Amino acid sequence: MPRQRATADGGGAALRVRWNPPDFALREPAERVLADAVRELGLAGVIHDLHVSIDAQNRDDHAYIEWNTHDHRAARLWFALGNFVTPKRRRMWSRTWARRSGTPPLMARQFSARSFAEACLHELCHLKDDHESGVDLSGHPESDREALNELWNVWIDGRLNRRGLPAMSRGERRRVFARTLVSTPRYSAVGERVFRALWRADHLGPRELRAYLEELKGPRGDAPARSRRRR
């Protein structure tokens, strides 16, 4: 069974965190970063339970979050192993472990609080936006979700960067945006303007995100297909 820990927030309430695997080597420093991210985003009075799963076979920096749109008190987070180390170490892993089986050893001194904070803040922003503005992908056609999620990602990382918090850089996000949306019919005409608008936006809602996608798709365009809220 995953181990449950309670971390007190600034107001004295306890954030319960369950880890899987329970003996994850970086659990204690990672949990401090996670609790800080919850407080930084003003979610300490909203989220009470977090279930955190580590994909130890994935050396990349993929992460995603799931929650019940009608109850924001609990959420599930999944993190690939690369979220806990620096980008430099991830690149080193890709060279030295590309043809090896198993996973690289992970020691406490390798933990990157900034890298993990970037992942935590980004994923928790998805829940925060649903809680405050009703932004969620579940009510949209499956074929639109990957594109809508990337528009949402741009908006999130733009806000985090303006606050000086750990986040994907503008250049990195722009490259992911291009890879995800380049096949939409009007990307070459409006893609750059849509990216700038999302990156600079402070307040958006589900209708605005949908409108940006429709602008990229054009009258009869289709967005690429996939799922979930991913970084």
Regions found by a protein language model. Name each.
Residues P2-T96, R159, R163-P166:
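Auxiliary, metal-adjacent structural segments of Zn-dependent hydrolase domains
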Residues A25-P29, S112-F116, C120, L148:
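Short amphipathic alpha-helical segments
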Residues T86-R90, D129, S133-S138:
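Short acidic/His/Gly/Ser-rich catalytic and metal-binding motifs that mark active-site loops
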Residues R89-R91, A98-S101, A108, S138:
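N-terminal, positively charged nucleic-acid-binding surface of large information/translation enzymes
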Residues R99-A119:
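Short pre-active-site segment immediately N-terminal to the catalytic Zn-binding motif
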Residues S115-V135:
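Active-site recognition of the HExxH zinc-binding catalytic motif
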Residues E132, H140-F177:
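Post-HExxH zinc-binding segment in Zn-dependent metallohydrolases
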